[in-house]
Regions:
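Short, basic, alpha-helical segments at the C-terminal edge of helix-turn-helix-like DNA-binding modules
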Residues: 62-70
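Amphipathic alpha-helical packing segments from all-alpha helical-bundle domains
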Residues: 114-142, 146-150, 176
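Short alpha-helical scaffolding segments that buttress acidic/His motifs in well-ordered protein cores
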Residues: 92, 106-110, 152-159
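Amphipathic alpha-helical segments used for helix-helix packing
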Residues: 96-117
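Helix-turn-helix
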Residues: 14, 18-56, 60
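Hydrophobic alpha-helical segments that form the core
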Residues: 143-165, 173-184
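Hydrophobic alpha-helical connector segments
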Residues: 60, 73-98, 145, 149-152, ...
């Protein structure tokens, strides 16, 4: 049986997701507390029992929901170099369809002067999480995490840009460089391994 705190936290997560979805559908400026409460199926007072104010709701909902987007994204990431081409071809379109509105809202919030410090903090966390992911990938694909991490950043940036603006040219040029880069790095580090790690 769940404790009261667990129930509270579960309900809060549910509210954050529904509020973020409501903002993503209707825009940040045109959405008031009544619309949020309606989307959550609760009263305005009930929302305020979970969040001190609208700013706290926006900040916490954005961080929570965008971490979930990251998790969705990274679950699809390849663990084998042979799978990279499929990943690079499919994921930008998948994430644009599934997360495009969320990316647009995230940038609207995190570039707002009121919330920019929270945006900086969120992206520091993104850097740490992607670096940790790259470290887990290193033994699986044979490329050092210090090389994988910037490749992840390039890929994610291109996907987010496409999800927001549907700029096919930008996406395809970035993806082509990534595919070639991964192939070159995989060959380089495989040959280093075969030569006892002496090759630079």
């Amino acid at each position: 049986m769940k404790t009261t705190e667990e129930q509270h936290n579960e309900r809060k997560r549910e509210l954050m997701e529904k509020c973020f979805e409501c903002y993503a559908e209707n825009g940040l400026t045109g959405t008031g507390i009544k619309a949020l409460a309606d989307a959550c199926g609760c009263t305005k007072a009930n929302l305020y029992s979970y969040f001190k104010n609208l700013d706290e709701l926006i900040i916490e909902s954005t961080a929570y929901c965008m971490e979930k987007v990251e998790d969705d994204f990274m679950e699809k990431a390849p663990t084998d170099p042979k799978d990279v081409v499929r990943f690079v071809k499919e994921v930008p379109y998948w994430t644009a369809k599934k997360h495009g509105k969320k990316y647009r809202l995230m940038y609207q919030i995190y570039t707002h002067p009121k919330y920019i410090e929270h945006g900086k903090k969120f992206f520091e966390g993104v850097n740490e999480r992607y670096t940790e992911y790259a470290k887990r990938l290193e033994p699986k694909i044979g490329i050092p995490y210090t090389v994988i991490t910037p490749l992840i950043f390039i890929f994610v940036r291109a996907c987010v840009h496409y999800a927001m603006f549907e700029d096919e040219y930008y996406l395809k040029t970035q993806m082509e460089v990534l595919k070639q880069g991964v192939a070159l790095f995989a060959d380089k580090y495989r040959s280093q391994y075969l030569n006892g790690g002496n090759e630079k």
